[in-house]
Regions:
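Generic hydrophobic alpha-helical segments
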Residues: 22, 26-30, 68, 111-115
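Phosphate-binding and adjacent anionic-ligand microenvironments
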Residues: 37, 75-255
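Short Gly/Thr/Asp-enriched flexible loops that form oxyanion-binding sites at enzyme active sites
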Residues: 46-66, 90-91
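Short, solvent-exposed loop/turn segments at secondary-structure boundaries
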Residues: 14, 54, 139-142
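Gly/Ser/Thr-rich active-site loops/lids in small-molecule metabolic enzymes
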Residues: 1-2, 56-75, 146-154
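Short, charged, surface-exposed secondary-structure boundary motifs
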Residues: 8-14, 69-71, 111-116
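Short, acidic/turn-prone active-site loops that include or flank metal/cofactor-
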Residues: 3-7, 62-65, 105-110
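N-terminal small/polar loop signature for handling phosphorylated ligands or for N-terminal nucleophile
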Residues: 1-51
Length: 255
């Protein structure tokens, strides 16, 4: 265990499974002591992430992939609701498992509410999860419960062992982007929402002709691209809580 002395100033790192420094800290400790796995929570344990014995980080898209394996194996054909900035590789991963991904607007409560709504409308949805680490299973009353998430992963391990597989093997089936970039543009005007939404509306007018607006998107504008600029996507959206435009880009080509 690390950092057992309570200190509300969090002097070691931000207690956040979506934070690079926090994940690097637990990864280094797992590798240093030769642990089988490492587990990290946020302060109120509604978010979690895992590090494998080989140092593979199971957060963000990787965590969604692992939990999707669990949900789809237990409920074939189920739908996984995620927030919008997830990779196209993840969508293909879920589809190849026999499941469906429903990308929705950011905010863990938005994702959970959409899953509840889909179930009421007759679409089986067993998992709602954000890249931030908030994950909620239908069987657990759609509570975002980090401890429950870790328990589900631990229960997956014997099934993997029977097949001669590990979490490391499992996550290697998910293609990883070569480059990931996030840029936050501050909107310095009083009516920032109107301004930001106008930028998003006009943005597709300025993209190259061979880039494509992805219709399966409910937040901001998502663009898919291939060719000389690589193979990837970008998402331009408003921040949930701040006067910011958030641009997220993933590419299978570095640079």
């Amino acid at each position: 265990s690390q950092f057992l002395d309570p200190d509300g100033t969090f002097p070691n790192h931000i207690p956040n499974p979506d934070n690079k420094e926090a994940m690097e800290s637990i990864k280094n400790q797992v590798l240093a002591v030769g642990a089988d796995y490492g587990v990290i929570f946020d302060t109120d344990v509604d978010r979690a992430a895992v590090v494998t014995g080989d140092g593979e980080l199971l957060n963000r898209n990787n965590l969604i992939a692992v939990l999707s394996v669990i949900a789809i194996s237990e409920h074939p054909g189920t739908t996984i609701v995620t927030n919008s900035p997830t990779t196209e590789h993840l969508k293909r991963f879920i589809t190849e498992l026999g499941g469906h991904q429903y990308r929705y607007i950011s905010g863990y409560r938005n994702v959970i509410n959409k899953a509840i709504e889909l179930n009421k409308a007759g679409t089986d949805c067993q998992l709602a999860i954000e890249t931030s680490g908030h994950a909620a299973f239908k069987e657990n009353y759609f509570l975002d419960d980090g401890a429950y998430v870790v328990a589900k992963i631990l229960m997956l391990l014997p099934r993997l062992l029977e097949r001669g597989e590990t979490l490391d093997y499992l996550i290697k089936q998910l293609v990883q982007p070569k480059e990931v970039v996030e840029v936050r543009f501050k909107i310095e005007t009083e009516d920032f929402k109107t301004y930001g939404n106008e930028v998003i509306k006009e943005f597709p007018q300025w993209i190259p002709q061979d880039w494509v607006v992805n219709p399966e998107n409910e937040e901001g504008v998502r663009i898919d691209f291939k060719g000389e600029y690589g193979d990837g996507w970008l998402l331009l959206r408003m921040s949930l809580h701040e006067p910011l435009l958030v641009l997220q880009i993933e590419n299978d080509l570095v640079g």
